[in-house]
Amino acid sequence: IGPAGENLALMAAVMNDKHRAAARSGVGAVMGSKNLKAVVAQGKKNPTLADTEGMRKLSVTISKEVGVDVKKGSSLREYGTAYVPQVTNTLGILPTRNFQTGTFEGTDQIDGVALKEKYLIRHTPCYRCPISCGRLTAVDDEEYAGKGEGPEYESIASLGSACGVDHLGALTKANYWCNELGMDTISTGMTIAAAMEMYEKGYIPEEDIGQPLRFGDADAMIEMIQKMAYRDGFGDSLAEGSYRLAAKYGHPEIAVTARKQEFPGYDPRGSQGMGLLYATSNKGASHMEGDLAYSEVFGVPEKIDPLTSEGKAPLVARFEDAFALIDAAGLCVFLAVRYVFDEDVNLWPTRLTQLMNLTTGAEYTPAEIMQAAERIYNLERLFLIGAGSGKNDDTLPYRMLHEPLPDGPGKGKVVELDKMLPEFYADRGWDQDGVP
């Protein structure tokens, strides 16, 4: 962990491989609270496999299957996740100025094309990955000079459009700082965005902050990141996250959170399934608990209408179970979703079952694997309920339920959570109070 974790900032991440982050839910602060700086694993032995030759053959098959998609022309390969701002902006769901709108006029200046033209050094793939979505970048602008990885889409949305910042060099520098300090870029950027809105509306006095904090002020944003990590001055309030910050100043409606965690980069008013996902995610607002954007936004395996709430409950449950399995197996989402949403619905459990059996020597069936996914999600849910977070927290912030989107294809829409939530409980076999 970095200084943010040491100072128990609630958006502190656990960093690994220099630029990779276990970022959400304040896990860095948990380590910091235990005076645990790092966990180190050392060893020279290779992992043992139950069937080495079988695994080799299956790996070749999987590489070819994934490679077919890559060869067709993958934006993920060419631009990394930085290609996504253009997609979400077109759909009107790009978080802009703390989710006050869903379109950002500066998108062209901070997207993957701009990043590739200005700052890209090379791709940084994980070992033998055919997708190669990682990016090593360097900013040569004197004011924001630096070198590192990223920014990824979520960082662009939270540190860029959500804060009204359209300077790619400043945004990239902010991303570097978050990595150096050990911070979740999503909660960091979204918390600053909430503070910017409250400052502009006169809810936070300038003397509390020590300086102006307006949307679009990249230098102020970067300074706030450093203050958050060290709990310096106003940074002490920011380090508590937007939910507590907004409550402190008497305007809880400004915070855009679920289970007190800041939203990622998809405005659910224009992506209804994402709204249900945020409300029911076991770790608070998260796109990594079952990203329905794959279908609503990217059309995988087929495009579904993001503006309707009809039929979204069973889809969200399916996505949540699939992502639980991906995490449990230690797989990359970008590789795994190629199977989760294949036209052949049996391909996903079949491939994962093969991987599990060749690794462990077990004889799982696809049905058993899928049942395990449901058990994982239900067990997490029971843990939450035991901690006092059940149906009462299966909700969304005021803005999502009562303030219609002002622009984009979803103009006039709010999240229809009251329609989707009972259907979701029923689909999962939970009672009307959301208890498995």
Q: How would you describe each model-predicted region?
A:
Residues 2-25, 31-436:
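Extended C-terminal regions of large enzymes
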